[in-house]
Curated annotation (Swiss-Prot):
The presence of a 'disulfide through disulfide knot' structurally defines this protein as a knottin. Probably participates in a plant defense mechanism. Disulfide bonds join C7-C21, C11-C23, C16-C28. It holds the Pfam family Cyclotide. This is a cyclic peptide. Signal peptide: none annotated. Belongs to the cyclotide family. Moebius subfamily. InterPro entries: Cyclotide, Cyclotide_moebius_CS, Cyclotide_sf. There is a cross-link at S1-K30 (Cyclopeptide (Ser-Lys)). One of its GO terms (biological process) is defense response. This is Cyclotide psyleio E. PROSITE patterns: CYCLOTIDE, CYCLOTIDE_MOEBIUS. Keywords: Disulfide bond, Knottin, Plant defense. It comes from Psychotria leiocarpa.
Amino acid sequence: SVTPIVCGETCFGGTCNTPGCSCSWPICTK
């Protein structure tokens, strides 16, 4: 399995502002 890279951003609305990151509630990963 691939270890997700944490983007250092939290996501409450389901979207992430950091480019290339996706919401894996409650944090953004890529």
